[in-house]
Regions:
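A structural signal for short beta-strand/turn segments enriched in small hydrophobics and glycine
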Residues: 59-71, 115
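Non-catalytic terminal segments and appended small domains
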Residues: 1-58, 91-148
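Short, Lys/Arg- and Gly-enriched loop/turn segments at beta-strand edges
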Residues: 72-81, 98-101
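Generic beta-strand or strand-like secondary-structure segments
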Residues: 67, 87-90
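Short coil-to-beta-strand transition motifs
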Residues: 19-22, 79-87
């Protein structure tokens, strides 16, 4: 897959060009009237090693901007905010027993859920738009780390 890459210090961040993105660090792959979602490479790197992930049950209705699940790292528990209005129709069975797959392969085998979208993908960012936003977020994180 084609992607944008951004290097900052020792970190390299990847943004897939074939996906859409929310400002809340969730990627979206349109699949007809459904969307497959997962956390971005930036989100999983910022949080560190994921030790636990939980997604709401199949059949749960979630509004855009509301939590559809969460993940836990050694540093933080992070809500995963839904990028669309919709109903969860499928949950990645791997993440229950191997949540670290989200760190290893966030855009493929580390996907989180499939949702039947009720709101479409309007308002989501293109890969190019998200890449520019992510670069700003990376710079902000590096400033925090360096204490500037």
């Amino acid at each position: 897959m084609e992607e944008y890459t951004h290097q900052a210090d020792k970190f390299v961040f990847h943004v897939r060009k074939d996906l859409l993105y929310s400002r809340d660090e969730v990627w979206v792959k349109a699949e007809g009237d459904h969307v497959r979602v997962g956390v971005t490479d930036f989100a999983q790197r910022r949080g560190g090693d994921i030790v636990f992930a939980e997604i709401s049950k199949k059949g749960t209705h979630v509004k855009r901007g509301e939590p559809l699940g969460s993940y836990e790292t050694v540093k933080v528990v992070q809500d995963i905010l839904s990028p669309v209005d919709g109903v969860i129709t499928e949950i990645n069975p791997i993440i229950d027993s191997k949540p670290e797959i989200i760190n290893k392969d966030p855009y493929e085998s580390g996907w989180l859920a499939v949702m039947k979208s009720e709101s479409g993908v309007e308002g989501l960012l293109s890969a190019e738009e998200y890449f520019e936003l992510m670069k700003v977020k990376v710079a902000e994180e590096l400033k925090k780390i360096r204490g500037m």
